[in-house]
């Protein structure tokens, strides 16, 4: 029977009772099995059919013990061929009908069906009817069933399908922990609708059987298992059917939808409130930041926009907007100068203080506890004019011969020594007295406690003596005057005291506060008195330092030592320096690899006021740079990187900018000569002194440009730099070129000059610069001629017959025509003849004929002065010292 292609499908659901239900009666009586066949015939509206009884067995109807129940259902006229609407009876009517036709189930333990069993069957049937009534499908859900659809993964008899009713047979399924038997039970009643694909296939065979391979049982009876296989467990009801979706009321749906919308709106409101609260907090923070702008900030000559905003507690975008209003397009990482930063800060009522490189990256140190302070040795600096006996005095104190190691007998390095006296240790710093070492003397005065001013009794006060006094006063340190060379016959101590008193150094015996000591370094006179005076002054100063904190000090000198690398001479001012300490010296960082004292002995630690040499620097610091130990090497490297970055920015600002105005000035003034120099020295202090001395030689016509200056030997890179930069001159001060550099210099024809005394280097460079200058042209009178007669020659003009009074007359020389003591014409000789022949020159006492260019008014008795133009070498001192023009910065306006 084709279900899909008929309008009146007859659905027959058959179930076979299981063998477990066919138990023998105990009384020996036999009951015939009864089978209930339910036929549902669907007719159109208004028509009816009589109930028909049919038997599937070979024996006929009533003889086989069957009961036939006919149920008539009407279908609506509007039903489609593939759809059936089922009109269910009321629960009470169905219950009565079930009571009439319900069979009595057999009990295994009883021979005949008892009233109690019958009552149980009625009760179970009633429960099934109630469940069916509760879960009956609506017409809309029945109409939507597609009988042709097949589910590929659903086997026949799968009771997990949705919409399956609970009025089915009970199979004897095994009771195992893994599941309820090996298969689903058969179906006792026919299904009205909601067939799955597997159920439709099981019914389409036209047999009354379950959806598995077992035979269907009667209504309410369990069916047989497939192929008469017994179950492993007792009888057990089938699995509960899946619930049929019940149509919800619109009111309930609307309530739930309203509740869901309300929850969504509540979430949105909460999110909006959260973001509004967050925005308010941000605005409050911004207002707080605006109110927390400091009254004063410290910056360097340049600062990035982000760093300035951080110092002012502002956003970088706000400052960028201000700069855009000023016509400057910058980014947050771009640097601006101090003037621009000052203008920006003034808009927020904030003052700007410009600090140095090291103040910007200062390492904060802890304050000293007075209980931890201990006495330290004094640091004494010996200063004075050159050749006044400073180093000789120190040699006499140290009982050594230091000056013999200096070239030219003058000190060109700052030396630091520790001397043990009967009153304790004293640290001496010996500074150069030559005028080229001004910076060295200034640094010596900064790191000292007492200044010993050495003045020669025979020379008196000299320019460097006055300079040393000024350095000591700037450093605010006391001065002890040591009058040296008092053993000389021409020594005049009173003259020295008088001159120094005029400069503000009044002797104690004259009522002042300056101590004077007369000494003789050559004969070692008065040295003990000098040491006692130093110790007395140190006792008055009460010099103390902390020995337990991180070491701090100053770099006195630095150099590159072959085999040891960068060597820095430092003096410890506070704390204790130990091997392995990470530190920062200037813009470079490092770790102390070794410590040496002033005698070259390796030591483990250095205490305050002790001068030492240390190894382990990454680069060579400048003399006078601060030295400080950090807590870790990482901190030292961070500070070093920051200082190097700021140093590079400062150097880039110092580069001269080529502007259109500068170009016009250069064209107008003519080409300026330039001598390029590379300076290499043994120590950084000497290199600095030589560089400053050479740069002072520049004039308006020639300029000396130091393109590179550093300590160390002359290497290949120096030669290549000189060759690439217009054959610059290399000056080596107390250093020599390496063999490779010397060979490369010969190939590239680079001039290398080596010096051991600084003033010799300055003199030779001055001569080289003078040789580059164009010579001066001067007039020199070489002869005097008297005009005794004149002749007119056609096409030539007037010729003067002359007599040479003195000197000589040369062809093409200049001539001045003097008449009555007045120069009436200045010109050039056009012709010179001796009789009729041309002559190159005519000596005194001879006659000659002279013609003058463009001049025919020559007369008798005129005097002719013969002039020769000669070249005279120029001196740098003849011209005004060069003053570098001010560089106009971009963005500045000039008054017109």
UniProtKB/Swiss-Prot annotation:
Q: Which residues form the signal peptide?
A: none
Compositionally biased intervals (Low complexity): 56-66, 168-177
The region called G5 is annotated at: 520-522
User: Which Pfam families does the annotation name?
Assistant: EF-G_D2, GTP_EFTU, IF-2, IF2_N
* Alphabetical UniProt keywords: Cytoplasm, GTP-binding, Initiation factor, Nucleotide-binding, Protein biosynthesis
Identify a single GO molecular function assigned to this protein.
GTPase activity
Report the family membership: Belongs to the TRAFAC class translation factor GTPase superfamily. Classic translation factor GTPase family. IF-2 subfamily.
What protein is this chain from? Answer: Translation initiation factor IF-2
In the UniProt record, the gene name given for this protein reads infB
């Amino acid at each position: 029977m084709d279900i899909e292609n008929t309008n009146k499908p007859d659905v027959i659901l058959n179930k076979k009772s299981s063998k477990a239900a066919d138990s023998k009666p105990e009384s020996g009586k036999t009951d015939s099995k009864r089978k209930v066949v339910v036929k549902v015939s669907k007719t159109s509206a208004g028509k009816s059919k009589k109930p028909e009884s049919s038997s599937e067995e070979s024996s006929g109807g009533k003889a086989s013990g069957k009961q036939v129940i006919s149920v008539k259902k009407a279908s609506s006229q509007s039903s489609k061929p593939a759809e059936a609407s089922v009109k269910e009876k009321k629960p009470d009517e169905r219950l009565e009908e079930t009571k009439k036709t319900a069979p009595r189930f057999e009990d295994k333990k009883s021979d005949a069906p008892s009233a109690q069993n019958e009552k149980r069957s009625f009760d179970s049937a009633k429960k099934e009817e109630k469940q069916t009534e509760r879960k009956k499908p609506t017409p809309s859900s029945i109409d939507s069933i597609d009988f042709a659809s097949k589910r590929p993964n659903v086997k026949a008899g799968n009771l997990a399908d949705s919409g399956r009713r609970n009025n089915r047979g009970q199979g004897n399924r095994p009771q195992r922990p893994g599941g309820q038997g090996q298969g689903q039970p058969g179906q006792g009643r026919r299904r009205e609708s909601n067939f799955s694909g597997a159920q439709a296939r099981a019914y389409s065979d036209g047999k009354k059987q379950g959806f598995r391979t077992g035979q269907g049982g009667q209504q309410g009876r369990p069916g047989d298992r497939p192929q008469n296989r017994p179950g492993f467990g007792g009888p057990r009801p089938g699995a509960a059917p899946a619930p049929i979706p019940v149509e919800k009321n619109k009111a309930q749906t609307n309530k739930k939808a309203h509740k869901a919308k309300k929850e969504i709106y509540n979430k949105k409101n909460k999110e909006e409130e959260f973001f509004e609260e967050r925005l308010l907090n941000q605005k409050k923070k911004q207002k707080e930041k605006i109110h927390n702008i400091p009254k004063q900030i410290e910056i360097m000559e340049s600062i990035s926009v982000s760093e300035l905003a951080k110092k002012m507690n502002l956003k970088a975008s706000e400052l960028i907007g201000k700069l855009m209003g000023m016509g400057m397009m910058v980014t947050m990482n771009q640097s601006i100068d101090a003037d621009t930063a000052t203008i920006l800060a003034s808009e927020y009522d904030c003052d700007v203080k410009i600090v140095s490189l090291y103040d910007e990256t200062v390492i904060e140190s802890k304050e000293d506890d007075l209980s931890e302070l201990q006495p330290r040795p004094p640091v004494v600096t010996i200063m004075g004019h050159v050749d006044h006996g400073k180093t000789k005095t120190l040699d006499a104190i140290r009982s050594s011969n230091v000056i013999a190691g200096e070239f030219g007998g003058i000190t060109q390095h700052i030396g630091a020594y520790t001397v043990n006296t009967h009153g304790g240790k004293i640290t001496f710093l010996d500074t150069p007295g030559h005028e080229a070492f001004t910076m060295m003397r200034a640094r010596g005065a900064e790191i000292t406690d007492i200044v010993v001013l050495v003045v020669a009794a025979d020379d008196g006060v000299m320019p460097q003596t006055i300079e040393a006094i000024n350095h000591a006063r700037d450093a605010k340190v006391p001065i002890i005057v040591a009058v040296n060379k008092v053993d000389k016959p021409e020594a005049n101590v009173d003259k020295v005291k008088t001159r120094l008193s005029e400069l503000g150094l009044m002797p104690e015996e004259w009522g002042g506060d300056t101590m004077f000591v007369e000494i003789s370094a050559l004969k070692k006179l008065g040295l003990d008195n000098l040491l006692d005076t130093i110790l007395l002054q140190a006792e008055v100063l009460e010099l103390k330092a902390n020995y337990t904190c991180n070491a701090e000090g100053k770099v006195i000198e630095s150099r590159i030592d072959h085999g040891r690398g960068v060597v820095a001479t430092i003096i410890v001012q506070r704390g204790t320096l130990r091997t392995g300490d990470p530190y920062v010296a200037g813009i470079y960082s490092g770790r102390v690899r070794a410590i040496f004292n002033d005698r070259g002995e390796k030591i483990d630690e250095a205490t305050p006021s002790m001068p030492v040499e240390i190894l382990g620097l990454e680069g060579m610091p400048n003399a006078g740079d601060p030295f400080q130990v950090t807590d870790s090497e990482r901190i030292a490297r961070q500070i070093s990187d920051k200082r190097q970055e700021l140093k590079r920015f400062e150097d880039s600002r110092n580069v001269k900018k080529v502007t259109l105005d500068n170009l016009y000035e250069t064209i107008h003034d003519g080409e300026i000569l330039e001598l390029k120099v590379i300076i290499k020295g043994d120590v950084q202090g000497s290199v600095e002194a030589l560089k400053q001395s050479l740069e002072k030689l520049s004039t308006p016509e020639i300029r000396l440009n130091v393109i590179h200056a550093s300590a160390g030997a002359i290497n290949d890179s120096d030669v290549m730099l000189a060759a690439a930069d217009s054959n610059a001159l290399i000056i080596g001060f107390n250093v020599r070129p390496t063999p490779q550099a010397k060979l490369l210099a010969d190939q590239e024809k680079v001039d290398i000059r080596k010096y051991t005394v600084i003033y010799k280097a300055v003199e030779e460079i001055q001569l080289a610069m003078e040789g580059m200058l164009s010579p001066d042209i001067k007039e020199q009178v070489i002869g005097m001629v008297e005009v005794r007669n004149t002749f007119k020659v056609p096409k030539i003009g007037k010729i003067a017959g002359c007599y040479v009074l003195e000197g000589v007359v040369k062809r093409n020389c200049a001539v001045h025509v003097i008449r009555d003591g007045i120069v009436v014409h200045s010109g050039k000789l056009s012709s010179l003849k001796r009789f009729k022949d041309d002559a190159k020159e005519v000596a005194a006492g001879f006659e000659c004929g002279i013609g003058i260019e463009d001049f025919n008014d020559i007369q008798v008795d005129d005097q002719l002065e013969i002039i020769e133009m000669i070249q005279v070498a120029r001196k740098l001192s003849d011209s005004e010292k060069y003053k570098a023009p001010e560089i106009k910065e971009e963005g500045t306006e000039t008054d017109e």
